[in-house]
Amino acid sequence: MILYHGTDIDSALDILNHGLDAAKLTALQLERPTQLGPGWYAAYEPEVAWFFASLAPGNVGRGYTVIAIDIPDDVLNQLVAARQAIRNAIVNVPFGAQQYWFDLRAFEVLNTHTTFRPYAGQEPSHG
């Protein structure tokens, strides 16, 4: 399955080069609202990821982007069964969309069994 994560440029480069880092993510999410608590969020559609990338705290003056995550179905199913991944509707946004939330405990599995890559698509026009 391909999922999409929107973030600022520096965070995207860090994920692409080093994988997910629970300590860094925890520091970034400190005192920031999250729908399901601390963890990593990935959307089904790249357009949704672009929306959240534009809201990333590190994007001001630096830019933002979307990365694609290729996660094998069996790995995703294993994480769901272990309650380390939850699929749910995104709330408090002006559109309907689905996402996966990944618990910090899932990062080792994600870093080992998934492929993170730059998303080649362009940000959708809002005009």
Description of each model-found segment:
Residues 1-2, 10-11, 32-38, 47-127:
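Conserved NAD+-utilizing ADP-ribose enzyme module
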Residues 10-34:
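Short aromatic-glycine-(Arg/Gly/Cys) micro-motifs in beta-strand/loop hairpins
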Residues 5:
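Histidine-centered active-site/metal-ligand motif
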